[in-house]
Amino acid sequence: MFNDGAYTGEVSAHQLAKLNISYSIVGHSERRQHFNETDEFVNVKVNNLINKEITPIICFGESNDQRTEGNYMDFLLNQIENSTKGLRKDKVDEIIFAYEPIWAIGTGQNASLQDIVEVISKVKEFISKKSFFNEEKIKFIYGGSVSPDNSYEILNSKIIDGALVGGASLDVDKFIKIIESVDL
């Protein structure tokens, strides 16, 4: 996400602002994997979006290797820190963080609610200790193979603020079931 200019196949924060776009996903695992986007580039995108008053949805997540080797939490906290470097505290209340465990996307493996809550709780604690945010204002959504089978548990957890639905959003019936699983 460049601030402005012509970048074929990309869109700038300026263009999004002119279209009155309110939210933009940055750091998605597919962008990191296929386009080699780094945390530092995600940070540039986040700053460009905030400067245009667009809420960034910052994706972060670990691979299966990082998870099984046991160093995943350090990796995740590093992603968060590098993606939010240099942000003014008064500008970051609107950021949404999307926990997207790469090992649970399209693999048939699902993160348990306990896995999700563990990561989100530790990341919230880390962020508030670093004084980036007021812990109560930090918003987290989950995006690791959300389906009608796991959406009720995820979307009705007190610590998870929503879902970043991937493949299931392409099937209208599945997507409607996910939406209907929310207790209002």
What are these regions (language model features)?
Residues 1-184:
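Active-site loop-to-helix "anion-binding N-cap" substructures in soluble metabolic enzymes
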